[in-house]
Amino acid sequence: MKEPFGFLNLIKPPGMTSHDLVDEARKVFGIKRIGHGGTLDPGASGVLPLAVGRATKLFEYLQESVKLYRGEITFGISTTSHDAQGDILEKKEASWITKEKIEEIIPLFIGEVQQIPPQVSAIHFKGKRSYEWTRKGVKVDLEPRNVRIENIVIKKFMEGEFPKVILDVKSSPGMYMRALARDLGEKLETGAFLSFLVRLESGPFKIEDAYTLEEVKEKALQEELGAVLLKGDRVLSHIPKISISEQQKTLLFRANRLPLDTEPGKNLIQLYDEEEELIALGTIKGEKRPYYFQPVKIFD
């Protein structure tokens, strides 16, 4: 039986870890070679892309994918983890905060900004994850990291003793919404935490196209798992593709290169066979004709 090969756009529910979902997917597909792209905190929900089978080799070409989050931030309360999973550190009445005051400070957090990751995070520090030090009661001084926040949009503001705001945030990978909530609270001198989080998009993966774990299991019962997997050209649409014949495919696998009448360059190219299966990634090389395709990844 041919190993499944593709990407699964899965919805992570709150309460499960990202690795929990990978374990469940391994049981459903019956293979171990499954990985996820972009960890979501246990309390968060939303899009969690999974690479199935040989598609795990492709994650490195998705790492710069822009993320879109929708998060609720509660002002006046600080927690140890900057989200609802942590212990409360301080409560401070913050009814004076208005939508206008939040609008005033939002521009400070757009563009290339420095952000200190949360103590409770998977960042490596002296051989361990930061959260492992935190569990031992050791405070670590994590270095600020450069992140890019492309846009922040206020979707809703709710007044009260501890006012809340719902924000849509588009950012580069590596940006922590929990840290953004913390920093907004510090700027307003009230403290704040991330009360809930949904990831709406991760690169080409969008929540409106995503499957729940239950839906995937149902497809497995119906022997229709192939229907939930996205092929490479859907996910790697930013990389040009070329289709080749079965004869050319055989030659590529035998010689580890393939003559192609395409101008050379540094940009990657996808090669697809007659069944529209991704078989290789590589570049066109050569100083004169005949130019040739040199693979950097082969999926045989």
Where would I find each of the regions flagged by the language model?
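Extended alpha-helical targeting/anchoring segments
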Residues: 121, 125-144
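Phosphate-centric recognition/catalysis
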Residues: 50
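Accessory RNA 3′-end/elbow-binding domains used by RNA modification enzymes
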Residues: 1-13, 17-36, 40, 44-47, ...
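Pseudouridine synthase
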Residues: 122, 164-207
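Short, charged/polar surface micro-motifs in flexible loops or helix N-caps
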Residues: 53-56, 78
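Short amphipathic beta-strand and strand-loop transition segments with alternating hydrophobic
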Residues: 150-158, 283-285
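Structural signature of FAD isoalloxazine-binding scaffolds in flavoprotein oxidoreductases
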Residues: 60-75, 140-154
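Acidic, low-complexity central loop/insert segments
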Residues: 61-114
